[in-house]
Amino acid sequence: MKQLAFVFFLATALVATPSLGQSLSTAGYEFVDAVKKSDGNKAIEVLSTHPPGLVDTKDGDGNTGLIIAISRSDEQWTGFLLNKGADPNLAGKGGDTPLIAAARVGFESAIEWLIGGGAKVNGTNRMGETPLIVAVQQRNLPIVRILLNQGADPDRADHAAGYSARDYAQRDARARDILKLIEDKKPKGAAAAAK
């Protein structure tokens, strides 16, 4: 009988009290909304009164504040979110990582910041695209150079067409400079094998 009374008490207490997840959901919505509206005061207010993981909250489309800021090439917000501990590898809509999102919009400074913050240069989205594949498709030579210098694999194929960054560059007559850069860059394993 005591056990039944305890279960009843516990059930009543749980129904009457909003869960931690519910309160974080509201705060998460407020935070992402502040990022979308570029409302720095609101973002700081919400972050200062909630757990640090809130910075990685996703919106209804599945994008984090970091990906939202990167998508609009917003240096101030991207830097702010990275300084607040945003995960540089947390994928958003379509599985795009922040690094893929930055390559897609040609946001060069974000590429450097993300890599400096531990972003995986060979991370993929749901279609198997890497940041390097996206940069090649965008014909963005400076970003291709940065990614290759940071160890991006030009021979990793995507799932969509089965092509690698090298393959895409070979197939695009307007990407000859990019192809040359890829061809001139020795794979990481080649230097070790030569020793």
Please place each PLM-identified region on the residue numbering.
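Ankyrin-repeat inter-repeat connecting loop/turn
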Residues: 53-55, 88, 121, 154
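Ankyrin repeat structural motif
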Residues: 39-48, 74-82, 107-115, 140-148, ...
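Ankyrin repeat boundary/linker residues
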Residues: 59, 92, 125, 158-159
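Ankyrin-repeat-protein effector appendages
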Residues: 21-33, 150, 160-161, 167-195
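Bacterial N-terminal signal peptides
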Residues: 5-16
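Ankyrin repeat A-helix N-terminal signature
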Residues: 33-39, 68-74, 101-107, 134-140, ...
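Alpha-helical adaptor scaffolds
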Residues: 70-79, 83-84, 90-118, 122
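Start-of-repeat signature of ankyrin repeats
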Residues: 27, 62, 95, 128, ...
